[in-house]
Amino acid sequence: VDCGQVNSSLASCIPFLTGGVASPSASCCAGVQNLKTLAPTSADRRAACECIKAAAARFPTIKQDAASSLPKKCGVDINIPISKTTNCQAIN
C-alpha cells in the first residue's frame, strides 16, 4: 500500500474530518471505498493504517468523532480505524 494512494483517496474527506461540513461528500465516500479496495490483506490494512495515522498527525484540527464515524457515514464496511491513536499492528 502506497501512502500517496491512501492520502489521495481520503483528501476529499478533509472538510468533513475537520468539522467544516456535516456529512462526507460523494467523492470522499468513493475514496473510502477505494481505500477498502487498496487494502485487501491484513498487512495492507496495517500499512494503510500507518499512512492514515501519519496524515492525521499533519491535520491537528481533525475531529476524532468525525474520523471514527466516516466509514459508517459512507456505508463502507472497512476494517481500518481512522484515528490518530490506533495501534495499527493490532489490525487483522
From Swiss-Prot:
Paired cysteines (S-S): C3-C51, C13-C28, C29-C74, C49-C88
Gene3D superfamilies named among the record's database cross-references: Plant lipid-transfer and hydrophobic proteins (1.10.110.10)
PROSITE patterns assigned to the protein according to its UniProt record, in alphabetical order: PLANT_LTP (PS00597)
Domain of life according to the entry: Eukaryota
Keyword field: Disulfide bond, Lipid-binding, Transport
Coiled-coil zones: none
SUPFAM superfamilies, sorted: Bifunctional inhibitor/lipid-transfer protein/seed storage 2S albumin
GO biological process: lipid transport
GO molecular function, one term: lipid binding
Family: Belongs to the plant LTP family.
Function as written in the Swiss-Prot or TrEMBL entry: Plant non-specific lipid-transfer proteins transfer phospholipids as well as galactolipids across membranes. May play a role in wax or cutin deposition in the cell walls of expanding epidermal cells and certain secretory tissues.
Listed name of the protein: Non-specific lipid-transfer protein A
Annotated source species: Ricinus communis
